[in-house]
Swiss-Prot record:
GO CC annotation terms, alphabetical: cytosolic large ribosomal subunit
Any GO molecular function: structural constituent of ribosome
Keyword S-adenosyl-L-methionine in annotation: no
Alphabetical UniProt keywords: Ribonucleoprotein, Ribosomal protein, RNA-binding, rRNA-binding
Subunit structure: Part of the 50S ribosomal subunit; part of the 5S rRNA/L5/L18/L25 subcomplex. Contacts the 5S and 23S rRNAs.
Organism: Prochlorococcus marinus (strain AS9601)
PANTHER family according to UniProt: 39S RIBOSOMAL PROTEIN L18, MITOCHONDRIAL, LARGE RIBOSOMAL SUBUNIT PROTEIN UL18M
Family the UniProt entry places it in: Belongs to the universal ribosomal protein uL18 family.
Gene Ontology process terms (BP): translation
Name of protein: Large ribosomal subunit protein uL18
Keyword RNA-binding listed: yes
Functional summary from the UniProt entry: This is one of the proteins that bind and probably mediate the attachment of the 5S RNA into the large ribosomal subunit, where it forms part of the central protuberance.
InterPro entries given in the database record: Ribosomal_uL18_bac-type (IPR004389), Ribosomal_uL18_bac/euk (IPR005484)
Amino acid sequence: MTKLSRKLQTQKRHRRLRRYLIGDATRPRLSVYRSNNHIYAQVIDDSAQTTICSASTVDKELKEKSEKLPSDCNSSSIVGKLLAKRAIKKGIKQVIFDRGGNLYHGRVKALADAAREAGLEF
């Protein structure tokens, strides 16, 4: 039996998670995508199929403060705080966390912890 690549394992976990992670207007889904260099997070209303708010390490607001954010846990926590601030501004306090098939560790965990500290509940 051949071993699955890390990317295929992540995709398989994500498909399995998405079966039961469905966000709506009252409790939207906080989706996280992690690449090698950046991290992206967005709050999605699946019933209306719209993105309510988003934040990433390539965001204009973050680029103005610093030239380039490294791909580490500190950058992820900055993105988590920014996303929580934007979500609360739009009236969202509770979300469903979708880690996107990634393990809840490192940059994904840092983003989640920062969003919780900034006021989001999940």
